[in-house]
Design a protein with these regions (language model features):
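Gly/Ser/Thr-enriched, mixed-charge loops and adjacent short helices
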Residues: 17, 21, 25, 41-45, ...
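Phosphate-binding and adjacent anionic-ligand microenvironments
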Residues: 295, 299-301, 322-324, 342-536, ...
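N-terminal small/polar loop signature for handling phosphorylated ligands or for N-terminal nucleophile
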Residues: 97-160, 258-313
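An N-terminal, well-structured beta->alpha segment
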Residues: 7-113, 203-232, 243
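Glycine-rich phosphate-binding loop plus the immediately following alpha-helix
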Residues: 166-194, 329-353, 357-366, 420
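Short Gly/Thr/Asp-enriched flexible loops that form oxyanion-binding sites at enzyme active sites
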Residues: 109-117, 160-167, 310-330, 365
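Conserved phosphate/anionic-ligand binding catalytic regions in large, soluble enzymes, centered on
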Residues: 46-66, 153-156, 235, 239-251, ...
Length: 580
């Protein structure tokens, strides 16, 4: 039995969407919901307002206050415009960049955003078609704009779309601007939105920005000579119907690779993602067609970018010639190992160089940094925090690479969001480097494990939906704080970190301060054998995440499978000790 009071509230909100201010299709969709005997669609669409969070908007497309549509996008943009005008009131001409991916309605939403900004007297640089997220970030810096909006829902299912807000450094908004924008958006009513655009303030951009961006991406190349020797490296690439199709094959060609094969069916721009269940390069199902082509061509590497081309997944052959997926931690490890090793070999390292990883990403990276005497910085999850580290050291230090376990990587500082364009090009260079030495990417990974220690990472998502679920997650975190674990699957905990208190406690009870830009509801436990467990509630979904990392030693590459089997056993023991 549906809650009568809730239905009445939703009906009242829905009635407002029958006003002439709303377009005919929207009014018709709302009428159908109101007239239907089943009120599920009405409740889902109107029981709350789609929340503009610290990352912007993300939701299912459709009519209603809890859906992505031109009206919810419009109110978000009006609020963002109001905030920009507050912050830059002394500026003669505020400007923004507007970009979008391949999703259904992405162009419509991008044009809506452009119209509203221009109606507010803000100059808009609007891309002529879909472009990668990193190019949006680049363009904000290129045009010295004060902000930007990217219409994308990354690798979410086809029903979703989203709205990412950027600041003048090309990074996603951080404090205090995130809260400032949210505050302004929450004050906007639909009648406040200025939908009628000013065409004189909208400039269509495209090829010139592509050229400028790709010229800068070429500077990421570390060893052009190895590419010349291995230009015929067999590369298979798929954009999964998304924005990578515009730029990534071109970037690979400009770097000097002459044997690039794109998965034909997935080079078609299509927001329905007809060839995959979910357009997520992390999962094997999304790479089915890519693996088909890679096997047929006996390729050296398969790379896939997600719909907005900011993350890259890859596959290569193992020691038995079987195709395997390389996960996000391993990819980040290979990237940073290669950058450090080869910058050193070519005499390109400076004392000012540093790398960044998120706190939940593999600690093998810390081992490499320590052994190679290079500064490594830890930051919170979310690429805006890596961008924050770059901003902190601008003009004083030299950022040479950073990444996270969730398949995001950035090898340059002229972009301030994760970049699958430069990542794919650099991955191809790393593969060429391996082939030049008679090795594969898999062999390189084994070499890293042999020198710095084996590591296996596993993420556990515990879902707890609804209000009771949110309360349960809060209680779990409270319990972990009041009674922190001392043993994890047989491993003795020797260091406890609480990022809400910004405090670390060692085995003797000695407390030290953790230096971070702000507090965050995250806990970490480190064990004497190198085991690490990180716990944090998701900021966007009703779940709590456990990131487990376990260590082992490899004597030879043939030990890998045995190490992995032991790691899986260890991970299960840790899960059991945490009642997961």
């Amino acid at each position: 039995m549906q809650n009568k009071e809730l239905i009445a509230q939703c009906e009242q909100k829905a009635q407002q969407w029958l006003a002439p201010a709303f377009d005919e299709d929207t009014r018709k969709a709302v009428e159908n919901m109101l007239n239907s005997d089943n009120k599920d669609a009405l409740i889902e669409s109107f029981y709350k307002d789609l929340e503009f969070g610290t990352g912007g908007l993300r939701g299912i497309m459709g009519a209603g206050t809890n859906r992505m549509n031109i009206y919810t996008v419009g109110m978000a943009t009006q609020g963002f415009a109001n905030y920009l005008k507050m912050c830059f009131k002394n500026m003669q001409q505020i400007s923004v960049v507007v970009c979008h991916d391949c999703r259904n309605n992405s162009r419509l939403f991008a044009e809506t955003v452009a119209n509203i900004f221009s109606a507010n007297g803000i100059k808009v640089y609007l891309f002529d078609d879909l472009r990668p997220t990193p190019e949006c970030s680049f363009a904000i810096r290129h045009f010295k704009a004060q902000g930007g909006v990217n219409i994308t829902a990354s690798h979410n299912p086809r029903e979703y779309n989203g709205y990412k807000a950027y600041w003048d450094d090309g990074a996603q908004v951080l404090a205090p601007h995130d809260k400032g924008i949210i505050n302004q958006v929450n004050q906007v009513k639909i009648e406040d939105v200025q939908f009628k655009g000013n065409k004189n303030l909208i400039e269509i951009i495209g090829e010139d920005v592509d050229k400028a961006y790709l010229n800068m991406v070429k500077t990421v190349c570390i060893d052009p000579d190895v590419i010349k020797r291995q230009h015929n490296l067999c590369i298979v690439y798929t954009p999964l119907h998304g924005a990578g199709r515009v730029i990534i094959p071109r970037s690979l060609q400009e770097w000097g690779f002459t044997n690039v094969h794109c998965v034909k069916e997935q080079m078609v721009k299509d927001g329905n993602f007809p060839t995959v269940d979910r357009p997520n390069p992390e999962i094997a199902e999304a790479l089915t067609l890519g693996l088909r082509d890679a096997k047929a061509l006996d390729a050296d590497i398969l790379m896939a970018s997600d719909p907005d081309a900011d993350r890259v997944g890859m596959a290569c052959k193992d020691s038995n010639g079987e195709w395997i997926l390389i996960n996000g931690n391993q990819t980040c490890l290979i990237f940073l190992w290669y950058i450090i090793t080869n910058r050193q070999a070519l005499g390109k390292m400076t004392p000012k160089d540093y790398i960044v990883k998120t706190i939940v990403t593999t600690e093998v990276i810390a081992q490499i940094a320590k052994k190679q005497h290079i500064e490594m910085r830890d930051c919170y999850t979310g690429f805006k925090w890596i961008a924050h580290e770059i901003a902190l050291t601008e003009g004083q230090k030299n950022y040479i690479g950073g990444g996270e376990e969730s398949y995001g990587f950035l090898a340059e500082d002229f972009v301030r969001d994760k970049d699958a364009v430069s990542a794919c090009s650099l991955l191809a260079e790393i593969c060429a480097y391996a082939k030049d030495k008679g090795k594969t990417l898999y062999d390189l990974l084994m070499d890293i494990y042999l020198e710095y220690g084996f590591s296996e990472e596993h993420t556990v998502n515990v879902e707890r939906p609804g209000k009771s679920g949110a309360d349960e997650i809060q209680q779990m975190m409270r319990n972990f704080r009041t009674t922190p674990p001392t043993n994890l699957g047989g491993s003795t905990v020797c260091l406890w970190k609480d990022y809400e208190a910004l405090e670390a406690t060692d085995a003797t009870g000695t407390k030290t301060k953790i230096t971070m830009p702000e507090s965050s509801n995250v806990l970490q436990w480190f064990c004497t054998d190198g085991t690490k467990v990180s716990v944090r509630p998701s900021g966007t979904e009703p779940k709590i995440k456990f990131y487990i990392e376990v260590k082992d030693k490899m004597q030879t590459a043939s030990d890998f499978k045995a190490c992995r089997a032991r790691a899986y056993e260890k991970i299960e023991a840790i899960k059991k000790s945490l009642n997961l």
